[in-house]
Every structure is written in C-alpha cells, then in structure tokens.
C-alpha cells in the first residue's frame, strides 16, 4: 500500500518544491524561509510536539501585515496542488486505479457467484437510469481560471508518468509545470464579484465541454466492454443510462437573482452551446465518413444514385441545420426578434435520425468498425445531452405559489385562498384543473412577485419539450402545494405534462411525506395526469440543520421506505430525488456507500441526485475521473437493485427510534434552546465574514436577520467546517448512541453495524467527520475570538465531541478512526500539516479584523478570504 502512496507523495513534494521556487522568485528568500519554518513546526506539532505547537502559534500571531497574505496564499495554493495530485492519484496507473479493479467487473463476478441469472442482470442494465443534477451551490470556491490551470497540472502529471520519456521531453513537461504553478501564484484566487446566475450556468456548461462530453461516451464504451465480457451482451445504441440536468439558472428558491428572464436566457444559451459542441462532432464525421457503399434506404435518403458520398451528404445537411440553428439562437440571445429557420433544431430526433440511419447502413455494409467509432460516440451524446445539452429543473418555494393563487382569488372576489382549509384548497384546485376556461383574466395586473411566478410558468410552456426536466417545490407540506403548480402550468398554456416533485426537507415534513403522497394518489384527476410516474425529492441539508444528522438520516430513511411501499401498492413507479450535498452535515457520503445504505427498492425508479459545487469538480473535473465516478454510480445502482440491502429487523427500528429521539433532543437543546448558542456560533466561526465571500449568486440567508433557522444550510455547515469543530455533522449522534448503549443495546448496535448498510454508513460517515475535526484548533478559535463568558459552552461541545469519538470507536470495534479506509486517513493526515497553519492564521486574522473599529485593513481582509478558501480545500468540502 505504501508504494501506492509514495507515487502520490513524490508528486505532492515535487509540486511543493515548484511552488517554493515560485514564491522565492516572486517575494524573496525570507518569505520562503518563513513558510518553510511554519510548515516544519506544523508537522512537528501534528506529531505531538507541544513546544512546536506553541512556537507555531507564536510565529503566526507575530506575522506582520505584509507577511499575512503571502503565507496564507502559500498554504492555500499548496492544498490546491495537493488536491490535484490526489485527483490524479485516483486515476493514475500507479495509484488508486491500479489497486481498484474495475468496479463493474467485480460486481458482475459477485452477482454470478450469488447465482443471479444473466437475464435478470440484463434487465437491470436495460432499466439503469442515473440522472445527475448539477447545482451551483456556492461551495465551489476555486475560481474557474484556476481550475483550468489545475486541470493542466493534472495532464502534466499524467505525461510524467511514462517511464520511456526522453530527457528533453521530461524537461519540457517540467518547464510547463513551473509555468502553471507560477501562473496560479500570480493569479488572484478570490473572486472580486459574485457570479451571476448566468455565470454559474456557464460554469456548468464548461464542465460538460471540458469533461463530460468526452467522459460519458468513454464510460459507456467501457461499460459496454464489461457487459460483453461478463454477460455477452451489448448496450443498445439508443440506451440512455446517464443523463445530466442542472439547477443553474432554474433554481429560484431563495435567490431573487434567478428570474424568468434569466431562465429563458439560460435555456437559449444551453441550446446554443449544444449546437457548438455538436458542430465539432459533425465536422469530424464529415471528414471521416467518406465511404460510398451504403444501403438502398440510405442512398434514397441522401438524394439518389448521383450522390457519390451519401454519408458525407447527410452529415453536411446536419451541419447546415446546426449552423442555422446556432445563428438563430445567437440572434435571440442578443435580444433580436427573428423568425426561426425552417429547419430549426428543437428535438433530439432531428439529430438522431440521420446519424442513426448512417450507423445502420454502415453496419449492414460490413463497416461495423467505422460505425462504432466517432459516430457511435456522437449518437450516445445525442441521447445523453441532446439539443438542450443539459435539461434544467425549475425550483421555487411552495409559499410563492400559494401567495400567487391567493392574490388571484382575492382579485376575482372568490375569497382569500390562503386562509382556506386544505380540503377547500384541494376542491378549488381540482375544479379549476378540470375546467376548460382560463382562470387568469387577460387584463389583470398582479404584484411583481406574482407576475414573476406566472412568467416563470410561461417560460416553461414556451420551452421546447424535453428542455425542462422537472418543477421542484421546496418546503412542500400538503397536497395542495403540488396541485397549485399544476394549475399555474395549465394557466400558462403548458402543452406537456411536466413532472412536479414536492421536496420534503424538515423533520416534520419528512414524517408527513407518505401521508401527503397517499392523499395525492387518491385523487382520480391526479392519477390520470401522472401516468403511473411520480418524483419525490428528499431534502438532506435542511432536515439535518433542523434536527441533527442522526435524527434527520433516520427520518429520511423512514420517509423513503414508506413512499416506496405506498407507490408500489398503488402501482406507481417512484423516482426518489436525493438533494444531498458534498459535506456530511448535508447528506454527503461516498456515492457507493450512500446508495447501498438506502431502503430496499429505493433505486427501482432510477437514481436522481444533486451534485454540488466543489463535488462536481472532484467527481467530474476530468474525463478520466468522470469515467470512474460514473462506474461507481452504475455499479452501486445495479447492486442495490439486484442485491437489495436487508429490511431492517424490528429491533433495529426500535433502536433507531431511541437513537433518533435522543440525538434530536440533544441537538435542539443546544442549537435552538440554549440562549448562548447563537452568540457563540457567531463568535467562534467566520459565519459573519463568510457573507463577504463572493461565492454564489444566492444570498447566504433566507432573511437578513434572525438566528440559525434563517441561515441557509450551506453557510451553516461551511462556518463549522472552518473552525474544525464540524458540529452539524455529529452533534447529537454520539449522545443518541450512548443512550442506546446505556439501555443495554451495545450488542444490537454491533450487529447493526455489521449487517445493516444504512447503519454502518452512518458510523463510517461519523468517523470521517471525527478524523477531520480537531479539538485543539477549535479551542484555539475560542481563546482568540470568543467572550470568556461563552467558553464553558465551547468546552462542553468539545467534551461531547471527545465522548462521541469514544462511543463510535467502541461500536465499530476499532482503536483508531478510519481503520478500514487507510487511504482516506492518509489523505487527511497529508493535508493537516498544511491546513493547521491556515486555521491558526484564520483565527488570528478574525481577531485582528474584529478588533479594528473602522474598516478592516485590506491586507487582513484579503488574507482572511484566502484562509477560508484554503481551509475549504484542506477539508475537501465547504458546505
């Protein structure tokens, strides 16, 4: 195992040396020496040397204002380079990739060992559906311009990995690496202005262009090979096991910057980008498909006998169609009113048909090897991305729909919809949904908020079918929340039935989710509308913020289990949409573990999950990483459907109820009921300063003033990650476990840990958080930043963390954290040496900036922002 890490460590050390050379060249020997001294002290302090720890604190406290920024940047940039080396390690032939046999090949072997029939496996492959929803959560701290440089660093590491390089080749690559490290150093790593929703959407398109466009067909090629080798089965050309959707430009929940006009613009931009990428593909096909032999059907399609190169002829027509469509979209984006061309591309079939005709003809004429080249990749892209490139979800909060309809009923003299009972609301909505006349009068001039809701529905109605994937209702609580959206879409003249997904995200809403859906499915009109398909979104982040991570995850499990059983009984195919984040407090977990820990049957309707902020870059930042991420997802979904996890035993459910109640009580006891908690949170973390980071287009708070409940889940997690207490990801969990142990359930817990993936994943996630948390750093933040009257609260929380770690180790029967995942333990240890100085420096900078009466020194502010970005890179997640 150590040989594996030695390759990564030598890359890390090489990149560190290059960064050191750059710093020395830019700022002189004395700054580099200062950075080196701090690094050595940090290493020694991590090894347990108390004197080094004290010296580290003194050194960082005594930095002059002009040393603050270079030191912060040095450690922050080093962590970015470490992450890049680690990402490369995961795909390097000498790293993880070498020791990780193909996830899919392993799975097929295991399935055969379990005596599953090949027919069952093929059916599961045919039904495989994975939809990844890219969201612009403000967690991707790294600027796009730096990401491009880091991607190129990755390419250089890959080039250096060849043993047969000539000296001049190696020198050339090293020279390029030096340039990239220097370019990064001389680039400002902190954005100066917040990205707009359109900027965020462009960031999403860049992920498609730079990674997914290559990565998806490459994964499907590999998947097809595994299927041929294991099952003697080919993936049908028209199969769409992978799809991408985006919330960028569609998610208006709590983000007033996402307007109907923005959504309209992003839809056009997305279609424009699709024409741009497909034109490149078609250009290659025009030059490749020079063959003349074809089937009579294709000859006729191409224009008869006189056409000498029929495939080329068809490709040129597609090229013209793409060019005309692109010109039209460009004019629309500039705000010009133009007539669409007669051959405007609006549906995937328009692209698919001529390409597939060429594919079939080539195969029929014995040219399968050509058909299965670039042409097959393009066909797969048409299926995965198509004319819209990425579909978008529209998300809005339930009260906005209620307010809009209430304003309308008041205007029409029907009374105040908002004050009606749920039964009256449903009766009114169903009556209107069945009515042939419009409800919204032509001359009505609603308020700006209502106008915005109606206009958004019009944008959906005008969009080509297939470019909007779903309408998600956040904070959904009752059946009328879902019916209201269907009515608003009907009033906008929407010509197709759009999936409307309620999002249940607080503890109470999760507990009521099954009841709400049962009522909806009992409405005949509704059953007729949905045609046997229903999507429900499960919120992870807000439920964890509301009740603590243990109670929330049990409520999520129970809600999913109940919904699966209700829909099965009603003959409805249920797609559960998981709104999980990158961090543990927002439901994040390694994909494979997370999927296998869900209730049996939860993936029958396919997987739909959000991929957030910085996790998009870690999982899909490079084509090679995309291939391995998709392979993990595919193998996890197939495994969950073919070898479902066990139904929990009655006793396990009872233990989880004890755990959940006790953990929720403790969590809320601190977070909601302790009057000192909010002042402590504001003082001990950079929560207030985080608002200054121009991260996403979305405000950090739902309401400008107010306590924890008004904070969005992301800044809440982000703040606690910065001071290394990691509180949202564990508070209450250990106390709940201890209560179960005190009730004599220790043996049961050990069995649950061994035999129940749901529970073992929870314990594994707690271990990961504990490995990243740090007691002495959290205490240092208190000493430097918190009023003495609040110190006892901080001490209580740290004592609780220590007790929780012991409980988890006792249940997992380990003597140290992450014993079964040494690779992650190694990765955390490698980073800590560089993250610790950033944490100490951050506490110092917060202290300085809060001491200053007037506006803080620009140097201090800038350095503070760099430490926030650096700690986020060190923790490998933000919020």
From Swiss-Prot:
User: Which residues carry out catalysis?
Assistant: 137, 545
User: Listed GO molecular functions?
Assistant: magnesium ion binding; phosphoenolpyruvate carboxylase activity
Query: Which EC number applies?
Result: 4.1.1.31
Which GO BP annotation is one of this protein's? oxaloacetate metabolic process
Keyword annotations from UniProtKB, A to Z: Carbon dioxide fixation, Lyase, Magnesium
Which chemical reaction does it catalyze?
A: oxaloacetate + phosphate = phosphoenolpyruvate + hydrogencarbonate
Q: What class of enzyme is it?
A: lyase
The entry's function note states: Forms oxaloacetate, a four-carbon dicarboxylic acid source for the tricarboxylic acid cycle.
Name the Pfam families on file.
Answer: PEPcase
- Which cofactor is essential here? Mg(2+)
Record's GO cellular component terms = cytosol
- Gene symbol of the encoding locus: ppc
Q: Does the keyword Lyase apply?
A: yes
Q: Which InterPro entries match?
A: PEP_COase, PEP_COase_bac/pln-type, PEP_COase_Lys_AS, PEPCASE_His_AS, Pyrv/PenolPyrv_kinase-like_dom
Alphabetized HAMAP family for the sequence = PEPcase_type1
Q: Which family does it belong to?
A: Belongs to the PEPCase type 1 family.
Q: Report what the protein is called.
A: Phosphoenolpyruvate carboxylase
């Amino acid at each position: 195992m150590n040989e594996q890490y030695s390759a990564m460590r030598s890359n890390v050390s090489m990149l560190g040396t290059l960064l050191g050379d750059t710093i020395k060249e830019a700022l002189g020997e004395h700054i580099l020496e200062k950075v080196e001294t701090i690094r050595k002290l940090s290493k020694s302090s991590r090894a347990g040397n108390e004197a080094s720890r004290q010296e580290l604190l003194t050194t960082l406290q005594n930095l002059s204002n002009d040393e603050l920024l270079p030191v912060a940047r040095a450690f922050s940039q080093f962590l970015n380079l470490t992450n890049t080396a680690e990402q490369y390690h995961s795909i390097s032939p000498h790293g993880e990739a070498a020791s990780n046999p193909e996830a899919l090949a392993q799975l097929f072997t295991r399935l055969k060992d379990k005596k599953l029939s090949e027919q069952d496996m093929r059916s599961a492959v045919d039904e495989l559906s994975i939809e990844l929803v890219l969201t612009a959560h403000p967690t991707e701290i790294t600027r796009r311009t730096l990401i491009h440089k880091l991607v190129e660093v990755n390419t250089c590491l890959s080039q250096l990995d060849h043993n047969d390089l000539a000296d001049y080749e190696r020198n050339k690559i090293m020279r390029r690496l030096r340039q990239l490290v220097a370019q990064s150093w001389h680039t400002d790593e902190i954005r100066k202005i917040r990205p707009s929703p359109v900027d965020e959407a462009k960031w999403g398109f860049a992920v498609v262009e730079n990674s997914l466009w290559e990565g998806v067909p490459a994964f499907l090629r590999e998947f097809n090979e595994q299927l041929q080798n294991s099952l003697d089965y080919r993936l049908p050309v028209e199969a769409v096991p992978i799809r991408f959707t985006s919330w960028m430009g569609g998610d208006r929940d709590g983000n007033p910057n996402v307007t109907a006009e923005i959504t309209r613009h992003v839809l056009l931009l997305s279609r424009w980008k699709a024409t741009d990428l497909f034109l490149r593909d078609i250009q290659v096909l025009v030059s490749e498909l020079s063959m003349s032999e074809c089937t009579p059907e294709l000859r006729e399609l191409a224009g008869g006998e006189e056409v000498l190169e029929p495939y080329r002829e068809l490709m040129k027509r597609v090229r013209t169609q793409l060019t005309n469509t692109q010109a039209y979209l460009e004019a629309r984006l500039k705000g010009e009113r133009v007539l669409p061309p007669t051959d405007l591309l609006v549906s995937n079939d328009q692209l698919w048909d001529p390409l597939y005709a060429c594919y079939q003809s080539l195969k029929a004429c014995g040219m399968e090897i050509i058909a299965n080249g670039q042409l097959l990749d393009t066909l797969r892209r048409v299926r995965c991305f198509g004319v819209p490139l990425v579909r978008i979800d529209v998300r809005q909060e339930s009260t906005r729909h209620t307010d809009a309809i209430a304003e309308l009923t008041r205007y029409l003299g029907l009374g105040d919809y908002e004050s009606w009972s749920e039964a009256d609301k449903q009766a009114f909505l169903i009556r209107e949904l069945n009515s042939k006349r419009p409800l919204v009068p032509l001359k009505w001039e609603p308020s700006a908020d209502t106008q915005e809701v109606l206009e958004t529905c019009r944008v959906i109605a005008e969009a080509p079918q297939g470019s909007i994937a779903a309408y998600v209702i956040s904070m959904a609580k009752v059946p009328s929340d879902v019916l209201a959206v269907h009515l608003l879409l009907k009033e906008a003249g929407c010509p197709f039935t759009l999936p409307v997904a309620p999002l249940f995200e607080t503890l109470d809403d999760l507990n009521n989710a099954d009841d709400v859906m049962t009522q909806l499915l009992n409405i005949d009109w509704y059953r007729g509308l949905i045609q046997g398909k229903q999507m429900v979104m499960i919120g992870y982040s807000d439920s964890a913020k509301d009740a603590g991570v243990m109670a929330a995850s049990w409520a999520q499990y129970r809600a999913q289990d109940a919904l699966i059983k209700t829909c099965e009984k009603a003959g409805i195919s249920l797609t559960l949409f998981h709104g999980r984040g990158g961090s543990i407090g927002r439901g994040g977990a390694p994909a494979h573990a997370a999927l296998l820990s869900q209730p049996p049957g939860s993936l029958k309707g396919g997987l739909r999950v959000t991929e957030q902020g910085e996790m998009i870059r870690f999982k899909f930042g490079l084509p090679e990483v995309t291939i391995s991420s998709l392979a993990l997802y595919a193998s996890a979904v197939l495994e969950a459907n073919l070898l479902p996890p066990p139904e929990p035993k009655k006793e396990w459910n009872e233990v989880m109820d004890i755990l959940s109640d006790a953990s929720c009580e403790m969590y809320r006891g601190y977070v909601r009921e302790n009057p000192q908690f909010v002042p402590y949170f504001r003082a001990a973390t950079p929560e207030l300063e985080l608002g200054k980071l121009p991260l996403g287009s979305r405000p950090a708070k739902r309401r400008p003033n107010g306590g924890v409940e008004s904070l969005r889940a992301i800044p809440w997690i982000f703040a606690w990650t910065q001071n290394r207490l990691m509180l949202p990801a564990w508070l209450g969990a250990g106390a709940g476990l201890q209560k179960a142990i005190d009730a004599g359930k220790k043996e049961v817990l050990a069995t649950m840990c061994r035999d129940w993936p749901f529970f073992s994943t929870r314990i594994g996630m707690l271990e990961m958080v504990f490995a990243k948390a740090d007691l002495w750093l959290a205490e240092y933040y208190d000493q430097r930043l918190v009023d003495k009257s609040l110190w006892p609260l901080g001490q209580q929380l740290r004592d609780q963390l220590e007790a929780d770690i012991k409980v988890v180790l006792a249940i997992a029967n380990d003597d140290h954290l992450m014993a079964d995942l040494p690779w992650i333990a190694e990765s955390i240890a490698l980073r800590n040496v560089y993250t610790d100085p950033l944490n100490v420096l951050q506490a110092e900078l917060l202290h300085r900036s809060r001491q200053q009466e007037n506006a803080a020194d620009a140097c201090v502010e800038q350095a503070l922002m760099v430490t926030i970005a650096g700690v986020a890179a060190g923790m490998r997640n933000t919020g």
